[in-house]
Design a protein with these regions (language model features):
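Conserved AAA+ ATPase small/helical "lid" subdomain
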Residues: 183-209
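P-loop NTPase catalytic phosphate-binding loop
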Residues: 1-89, 95-176, 182-185, 196
Length: 209
């Protein structure tokens, strides 16, 4: 799972666009699929017509999120059964024996989703999905503007963390869960990510279709 935290305009949506563009260029829809819940800038609908894209859900279609979670539950249950039949314990081993697309579920501004009635109803289930899905080739990407938008129990499920243009080094420390002694320059797309327990400076790139 990937957690991206940054102030408004720091490049969170740009990160998602670049990641999805890169993945869809490298992998077919048999290898990689994604679902988007866009409660931010509504710029991610550009991916709607790609064969890799299962759905783009926004505020006016938020009720569809319930159907999405039902689908994801079915996928995980089917993969549990398949893994047992293949006698494997994780997605990497199973994918060597059978074509199984890696699935990424993207929440751009997860706090916006959680403020909806549908989001409030599904919050506890979302915790379950984060904990149980990654072993079966289903991962999540959350973007948040502040560390307090999701609780610590939820944050602990995210092993990959990226911080973009936060207010001070203490916020970087909180979100990355590693001690940060410096702040990156205030440049578009500049941030810090946690790598093997160390904070490393990074630079995002914008894709050009």
């Amino acid at each position: 799972h990937i957690l991206v935290c940054g102030e408004s305009g720091s490049g969170k949506t740009t990160f998602i666009k670049t990641l999805l563009y890169s993945m869809t260029r490298k992998h077919s829809s048999d290898q990689f699929q994604f679902y988007i819940l866009d409660f931010s800038s509504h710029l991610l609908k550009i991916f709607r017509n790609l064969p890799h894209c299962g759905a783009v859900i926004e505020e006016d279609t938020v009720e569809q999120s319930m159907e999405l979670f039902k689908l994801l539950t079915t996928i995980i249950q089917e993969r549990k059964k398949l893994f047992s039949e293949l006698e494997v314990s994780n997605y990497s081993e199973a994918a060597k024996l059978k074509k199984l697309p890696f699935i990424l579920v993207v929440f751009d501004n997860v706090a916006g989703f959680l403020q909806t009635k549908a989001g409030q109803k599904q919050y506890d289930m979302l915790q379950y999905y984060l904990k149980s899905s990654v072993n079966y080739g289903v991962s999540y990407l959350f973007t948040i503007s502040h560390v307090n938008e999701i609780n610590m129990r939820t944050r602990q499920e995210f092993k990959q963390r990226i911080a973009l243009q936060l207010r001070d080094r203490y916020e970087y420390t909180d979100i990355l869960n590693v001690k940060c002694m410096y702040m990156p320059p205030e440049l578009p797309g500049r941030g810090i990510y946690s790598y093997e327990g160390r904070p490393l400076e990074m630079q995002l790139a914008m894709f050009a279709p």
